From Swiss-Prot:
GO terms for cellular component: cytoplasm; cytosol; Golgi apparatus; plasma membrane. This is Nitrogen permease reactivator protein. The modification Phosphoserine is found at residues 47, 85, 90, 100, 111, 116, 125, 137, 141, 257, 259-260, 288, 292, 317, 320, 328, 336, 353, 356-357, 385. The gene is NPR1. The keyword Transferase applies. Residues 16-38, 151-175, 238-248, 290-305, 314-339, 346-357 have a biased composition (Polar residues).
Length: 790
C-alpha cells in the first residue's frame, strides 16, 4: 500500500472519529516526496478523484513543477456527492465537480480544461505529461492557461477552415434511392449534424441546427365559408384600394415571393386602372403600332400548375443537336420594370404593372404622346384593378416600348394575347433592341429551345450572340413557358466563371424573347471535326470543361446536357459551357439534402445509363459521364455508341463481361466499404459468379476495356472511373481534378490583371482555328447539304 493511500485512509478515520459534518472535499497535508508516487497504483487503491495543487508561486504553478520543501494540498472529491463545497473548503466553487459529473461529461471537461497536454486516467483525473494531476484548486493558472491556449487554437483553426464545395459535400446517390422520405430525412439530418460538427466548431453545443430551408405550411382539411372570398369581392376591393390611393404621390407594391418577381419580369396582366400619380424622374421612348386597348377582366386560376420538367431534347445526330447558349453575368437588379404606355388618348385606360422591384426601388412613369419626355412634367396615368398576385391584364394590338433609369434600362412590350413582357439591361441607352443592335443574318445554330444568330452593337461595333427563344407551344401553359425561359436566364446571369458563357441582357421585341450573350468564334465540335487538334490541345480543352463543371457543382448546380455542341471556344483558346436550359439544383448551401433530378434530357450518345432507366437520379455523376464521352469523342472523332441502351450492340458489349446479367443491377451497385487491412483485402478471393457474362480482362471487345483500350494509357484510369456504369461508384469532380494526369495538363486559363484578365496560354500546344464558314454547326450543316446536292 502506498504512503499516499495510507495517509488518505488515516485522514478519513480522523474525520469519522471527530463526527464532523459531511463535506464534498477533504484536505490533508503531505510531504513533497509523496508527489513522486505512482499515480496508477494510487488510483487502484482509491475510489476517489484526486487533484493536486501547489501553494507556491504562480510561475511554478504554470509549469506544474513541485517546489522542494513546500507543502502540497491534496483535495479529494467524493464520487457519491454532488453538493457544493462548504465555505471552509479549500476548493473554489467553480472547480467542484463530482466524479459522476466528470465521467458523464468528459468530452466537455476535456475541452474546457484543454487536453492537448493532458491525458485522463480511468477514474476521471486529468493527468499531464509529467505524471502529475493538472487541476488547480485556487489559482488554476496552469489549467486556465491551457484553456486559453486551447480556445485560441480552436478559434484560429475554425476561422481558417474552408467550407467545402457542394460538389463533394454529399456522396453520390444510387438512382431512386430516396423513395422513403422518412429515412431520407433522418439520414440528411444526421449528415447535416456531422457537417456542422466538422465545419462549425464555434457553434455552441446546446443549440439545434437548421438543416433545411423548406418551411411547410399547416395542412387544413376544410375552410369555413366566412373565410372564403370570391373573385368579385377581391376585384372590387382592389379597385377601391386603387381609388383610395389615387391621391397619393407614390404607391408601393410588393410581390409575395422572389419567384413571382421573376415571373413578372416577363409577363404582367393588367385590368382597368384609374388613378393619378406623379412620375419619378425617368425618360422613356416608345414605339407603338396602332394600339386599341380593350380591357379584359382578370382570369384567376384556382389550381397551381405543377413544376414543369425540362423538355426532352435528344438527338442522335450531332448536326441536329440543340445549341442554346446561355451564359454567366453577375446581375444586380436595381429596380423592377414597369409598363409604360404611349399614344393613348386621355380617356382610355392604361394598364400598370403591380409588382415590386427586387432592389426596393419603386417608380412611376409618366404617360405621354411623344416618344421621349422629360421627367419634370406631371402626367395623369389612369390605373385599373390589380390582382392579389400583382398581375394585371391588358389587351391591345402589337406594341413595344423601352425606357431607361440611370444606368439601367427597361423595355415593355405587348402582344395580341394581352401579354406584357419586360426586359432589363445594364447601361442601356433607353432605345429599343432593334435600334441598338444590327442582326448580321449569320446563323450560329438552332435547336429545340430556339436559334442563335450574330448581332452587332451599334455603339461600339462589338459582336454578340443573340438567342431567339422559341414561341410558346399551343399545348404549353404560359406558366411553363415563362418558367423555362426565366430559369435559364436567371441561371445564366448568376454564374460568373471564365469557363461559363456570359449573359449580357434579355429583351422582348416583336413577340419574341431575345437573350444577348458574349460571342465565341468557334464551336468546339467544329474544331474537333476539322481533325487538326493535337493531343495536348484536346487535353487542354478537356480540363477546361472539367473546370467549368467543377464550378457548377461547387455551387450546387448540374448542367445535365454536356456535349460538344454546348462547348464553344474563343480565339484565345478559352472553352466556355453554354445552354443551361436543362440545368438543375442538386443541393442548397448549408443543407445535406440531395435534390434528385428527373426526366431524359440531352443527346442520346452523351446520356448516362441511369437517365434512361430510372425516373429519379443524382445529376452530378451524369455530368461526369458526359464529360468522359466528350473526351472520347475528341480522341476517337466518333461516338462510342449511339444510345446507352442494350439494343445498341456497341453499348451492350461495353456492359458485358462484368459478372452480372442485369443492367439495372450494374447501375445500382454501391462502392465497396474501405477495408481495415489492405493486405487482407488483396488476399481475399471474390466468390465465383454464376453469371453468363463472365469477366475477361484480356478481351478488349467486351467490358470497359472496349472503350478504354482506344484511349491513351495515362488517361485510362480516370476515364474508367468516369464511365463506371454505377453512378454511385463514379469519381466526383474533386477526385477527378486531383488525378495526376489531370493535374499535369498545361491548361490555358485567365488570370486577374488589375481590372481586367489576361490569358495564360499553355506552352505545349496551340489552339486550332478554322475558317468562319466552318466555325459553327450551322456552317457545317450548309457545307454538308452542298456536298449532298453535288
Amino acid at each position: 500500500m502506498s504512503s499516499l493511500t495510507r495517509l488518505l485512509q488515516e485522514k478519513r478515520k480522523n474525520e469519522t472519529s471527530n463526527s464532523s459534518p459531511r463535506t464534498s472535499a477533504d484536505t490533508l497535508t503531505t510531504t513533497p516526496e509523496s508527489q513522486s508516487l505512482d499515480l496508477h497504483s494510487r488510483n487502484k487503491s482509491s475510489s476517489h478523484i484526486g487533484s493536486v495543487s501547489n501553494s507556491s508561486s504562480s510561475d511554478r504553478n504554470r509549469a506544474n513543477v513541485p517546489v522542494p520543501g513546500s507543502v502540497t494540498t491534496v483535495t479529494q472529491i467524493y464520487s457519491e456527492e454532488d453538493s457544493s463545497s462548504t465555505a471552509g473548503s479549500s476548493l473554489d466553487d467553480r472547480n467542484q465537480f463530482s466524479s459522476s459529473f466528470l465521467n458523464a461529461n468528459f468530452a466537455h471537461t476535456a475541452s474546457f480544461y484543454g487536453t492537448s497536454a493532458q491525458s485522463r486516467d480511468r477514474f476521471g483525473s486529468l493527468i499531464n505529461d509529467q505524471g502529475t494531476a493538472g487541476l488547480s484548486s485556487h489559482g488554476g493558472s496552469f489549467a486556465a492557461q491551457n484553456r486559453i491556449t486551447s480556445r485560441l487554437s480552436t478559434t484560429s483553426h475554425t476561422s481558417g477552415r474552408a467550407i467545402p464545395s457542394l460538389s463533394s459535400s454529399i456522396p453520390y446517390s444510387v438512382p431512386n434511392s430516396n423513395k422513403d422520405n422518412n429515412s431520407s430525412n433522418s439520414n440528411s439530418s444526421s449528415l447535416s449534424s456531422s457537417w456542422l460538427e466538422t465545419y462549425a466548431g464555434g457553434m455552441p453545443n446546446n443549440i439545434s441546427a437548421i438543416d433545411s430551408n423548406v418551411i411547410s405550411s399547416p395542412k387544413v382539411d376544410s375552410v369555413e365559408p366566412r373565410f372564403v372570398i370570391s373573385k368579385q369581392k377581391l376585384q372590387k376591393a382592389s379597385m377601391d384600394s386603387n381609388n383610395a390611393n389615387a391621391t397619393q404621390s407614390r404607391s408601393i407594391s410588393r410581390s409575395g415571393s422572389f419567384s413571382s418577381q421573376l415571373g413578372n419580369f416577363f409577363f404582367s396582366k393588367n385590368s382597368k386602372e384609374s388613378s393619378n400619380s406623379n412620375s419619378a424622374g425617368m425618360s422613356f421612348s416608345a414605339n407603338s403600332n396602332g394600339p386599341s386597348p380593350n380591357i379584359k377582366n382578370p382570369n384567376v386560376t384556382n389550381g397551381s400548375t405543377p413544376i414543369p420538367k425540362p423538355i426532352r431534347a435528344r438527338q442522335s445526330s450531332i448536326y441536329s443537336a440543340s445549341r442554346q447558349p446561355t451564359g454567366s453575368y453577375t446581375d444586380n437588379f436595381y429596380g423592377s420594370p414597369s409598363s409604360v404606355h404611349d399614344h393613348l388618348p386621355p380617356s382610355q385606360s392604361v394598364p400598370r404593372s403591380q409588382h415590386s422591384s427586387i432592389g426596393d426601388l419603386k417608380r412611376f412613369f409618366k404617360k405621354s404622346s411623344n416618344s421621349n419626355l422629360s421627367s419634370n412634367s406631371n402626367n395623369v396615368i389612369p390605373n385599373g384593378s390589380p390582382l392579389s398576385s400583382g398581375i394585371a391584364v391588358p389587351s391591345h394590338s402589337h406594341s413595344s416600348s423601352h425606357f431607361a433609369a440611370g444606368n439601367n434600362s427597361y423595355s415593355t412590350s405587348y402582344n395580341g394575347n394581352g401579354d406584357t413582357i419586360y426586359s432589363h439591361s445594364h447601361g442601356g441607352s433607353g432605345i429599343p433592341f432593334s435600334k441598338r443592335y444590327i442582326k448580321t443574318g449569320a446563323d450560329l445554330g438552332a435547336g429545340a429551345g430556339g436559334s442563335v444568330k450574330l448581332a452587332q452593337r451599334i455603339s461600339d461595333n462589338k459582336i454578340f450572340a443573340v438567342k431567339e427563344f422559341r414561341t410558346k407551344f399551343e399545348n404549353e401553359s404560359k406558366r411553363d413557358y415563362v418558367k423555362k425561359i426565366t430559369s435559364e436566364y436567371c441561371i445564366g446571369t448568376t454564374l460568373n466563371h471564365p469557363n461559363i458563357i456570359e449573359t449580357i441582357e434579355i429583351v422582348y421585341e416583336n413577340d419574341r424573347i431575345l437573350q444577348v450573350m458574349e460571342y465565341c468564334e468557334y464551336d468546339l465540335f467544329a474544331i474537333v471535326m476539322s481533325n487538326k487538334m493535337s493531343y495536348e490541345e484536346i487535353c487542354c480543352c478537356f480540363k477546361q470543361i472539367l473546370t467549368g463543371v467543377q464550378y457548377l457543382h461547387s455551387i450546387g448546380l448540374a448542367h445535365r446536357d454536356l456535349k460538344l455542341d454546348n462547348c464553344v471556344i474563343n480565339e484565345k483558346g478559352i472553352v466556355k459551357l453554354i445552354d443551361f436550359g436543362a440545368a438543375v439544383v442538386f443541393s442548397y448551401p448549408f443543407s445535406k439534402n440531395l435534390v434528385e433530378a428527373s426526366g431524359i434530357v440531352g443527346s442520346d450518345p452523351y446520356l448516362a445509363p441511369e437517365v434512361c432507366i430510372f425516373a429519379k437520379y443524382d445529376p452530378r455523376p451524369v455530368d461526369i459521364w458526359s464529360s468522359a464521352i466528350i473526351f472520347a469523342c475528341m480522341i476517337l472523332k466518333k461516338f462510342p455508341w449511339k444510345i446507352p441502351k442494350l439494343r445498341d450492340n456497341s453499348f451492350k458489349l461495353f456492359c458485358s463481361g462484368r459478372d452480372c446479367d442485369s443492367l439495372s443491377s450494374l447501375v445500382t451497385r454501391t462502392p465497396d466499404p474501405p477495408s481495415y487491412d489492405e493486405s487482407h483485402s488483396t488476399e481475399k478471393k471474390k466468390p465465383e459468379s454464376s453469371s453468363n457474362n463472365v469477366s475477361d480482362p484480356n478481351n478488349v471487345n467486351i467490358g470497359p476495356q472496349r472503350l478504354l483500350h482506344s484511349l491513351p494509357e495515362e488517361t485510362q484510369h480516370i476515364v474508367g472511373r468516369m464511365i463506371d456504369l454505377a453512378p454511385a461508384c463514379r469519381g466526383n469532380i474533386e477526385e477527378i481534378m486531383e488525378d495526376p494526369w489531370i493535374r499535369s495538363i498545361d491548361m490555358c486559363h485567365l488570370v486577374e490583371d488589375g481590372l481586367s484578365f489576361k490569358v495564360v496560354r499553355g506552352e505545349d500546344h496551340h489552339h486550332t482555328q478554322v475558317d468562319q464558314s466552318e466555325a459553327h454547326i450551322a456552317g457545317l450543316e450548309k457545307k454538308k447539304k452542298k456536298q449532298n446536292n453535288q
